[in-house]
Amino acid sequence: MPENKNDKENKNDKENKNTKEEKKKVKFSNIIWVYIIFAVFFIGALISLNWENNPIISYSEMLSLINDGQVESMKINQNGNVEILSKDGTTYESFSPALVIDKQYVNSLIQKGIKVEYVESVGTKWWFGLLINIIPIVVMVLFFFWLYRSASAGARSSMNFGKSGAKKYEPIGEKVTFKDVAGIDEVLDEIEDIVKFLKNPQEFQELGARMPKGTLLVGPPGTGKTLTARAIAGEADVPFYYASGSDFVELFVGVGASRVRDLFKTAKENAPAIIFIDELDAVGRQRGAGLGGGNDEREQTLNALLVELDGFDTSTGVVVMAATNRPDVLDKALLRPGRFDKKIMVGPPDVKGREEILKIHTRKKKIAPDVDLKLLAKRTPGFVGADLENLVNEAALIASRKKKNQVEMSDFEEAIDRVLTGPSKKYRIISDKEKKILSYHELGHAVLAYLLPNTDPVYKITIIPRGAGSLGSTLQIPEKDKYLIKKSEILDRIVVALGGRASEKLVFNFATTGAKDDLRKATDYAKSMIYRLGMSKRMGPVYWEGEEEEIFLGSELTKQRNYSEETAKELDVEVKKIINSMYDKALELLKQNRERLDLLASYIFKNETIYGEEFKKLMSKDLEELKEYIGGEKEINEFLKIDVVNHVNYQPV
């Protein structure tokens, strides 16, 4: 008769309890042996400290002491050993059998005032000597016995070395369920079948259907792959065994394979159950691509995993799940149907998903009424679940730092800035000369972003230093999520990226290091157009990006180039052509709006930060109205008088 679920759980709990009790006994026994050895050494040290080492004198020296009247008392035993106490308190030992026999001489000693006493033993007690001889032997015996026990324990430990290190997930407090997962509704729809199968497998088997043997969750870090697996365990209410891929790989060949077999054995014994392997790429990388024989252990572990996935019966009720953010390096045999035959993409959430995730993470926070989660979701494109959780926590920390009772919208906006660009450098002192350069640089980006039709709206312009190397920033946030980008949009993005350098050229006629990141972005956009997207008329709709050569277990060491040197030169020429033409366009647009650029630069020089709504109003005003709004001619002239060229050593363009 097969065991029911409760019997199996009771059996498993009993085994775990017995294992814990055995560990406690072994630990207690080891402590006792340590105390015994310590006690033996302590007694030996105590005996050695109390050892009476009296000086031994000859018979003639003893007679000399007696004749000189220096003896206070004498103790004599039947063997002729004599203990002499002198009047100055010194104790001597000597040997004189005659004192045992010659009673007359002893009487003469008594007449001289010497106290004479016959005793059984003289000097060092007999058991002291016995202990001194026995203690080293006892210590050696105990030491070797302890070594023997340690070796036995080591043998037992080595027997357990191949045991799986997978942990059984036991939630503390409330279980994680699908209510705690948001922003990935399509993923939850896909994995709902797994929960139904674990709860009622007969429903599937009656129709002749089988569950996929392995389900692979694929997606960028922080999208909720592990959280999804925990939610499945909470919904299905079955044992959930989880391990990291790195837990299986050890120094010794064969250990990882043994752990894989042990994990599947444990799961089968407690079926229905879920096995979840996080970071699968640590153990499931491509075989046979290594530069040497150092990956034998990894390959054996992978082979064992392949056998277990293909070898166990799906009717046992064991579901295998895994997560990775590097599906490109996984072994092809691992992904074939019959193993991890169901792949679920867990991507970044859209704006609606981000709003739902923010609702979950703000449930237990004291949120002010002015907080608009829908607006926050729009302002955080590209954020994944982990980023949003960090954002909410950062906002709560900011509010706490300001001694607020609730987390306000301003705290969330500051948290967005901290997450995107790092904390503000409040105590970094920037000279007026460099501040003026930063003002023109950032306004160069912002003005072009406003003028060009295919760019995202400006959210914030600031010349406050943030993070490691950012002296200022112009943040643009899309109004909605985009999945396709037109060529005209990419070109406009390049123009905006080059706006800072173009503004420096136009106003100061020199270049600064502040445009380094802008140039990298512009170059990446241009290379993508030519090498990967086929957006060049001259080079045609061809994908020129080289194939990645996976030299060592999927790591990208080089890229194989499948075109000639002449073609490579032509590709580089096309990239430069795009960059140069967009730079010229940026310069021309800024020239046409030079007066507005000066006015806005003086405004941000004074205020340091301009938000999107205010920036739109400033750009929509006519020049006279804008000049009056900023503060009039006097304020603008003071800003323009700041001499930058003669005081700052910058490289001319």
From Swiss-Prot:
Matching SMART domains: AAA (SM00382)
Membrane topology recorded in Swiss-Prot or TrEMBL: Multi-pass membrane protein
Cofactor: Zn(2+)
Cellular localization per UniProt: Cell inner membrane
Transmembrane segments: 31-51, 127-147
Domain of life, source organism: Bacteria
Segments on the Periplasmic side according to the record's topology features: 52-126
Assembly behavior: Homohexamer.
Function: Acts as a processive, ATP-dependent zinc metallopeptidase for both cytoplasmic and membrane proteins. Plays a role in the quality control of integral membrane proteins.
Name of the protein described by the UniProt record: ATP-dependent zinc metalloprotease FtsH 1
Organism taxonomic ancestry: Bacteria, Thermotogati, Thermotogota, Thermotogae, Petrotogales
Gene: ftsH1
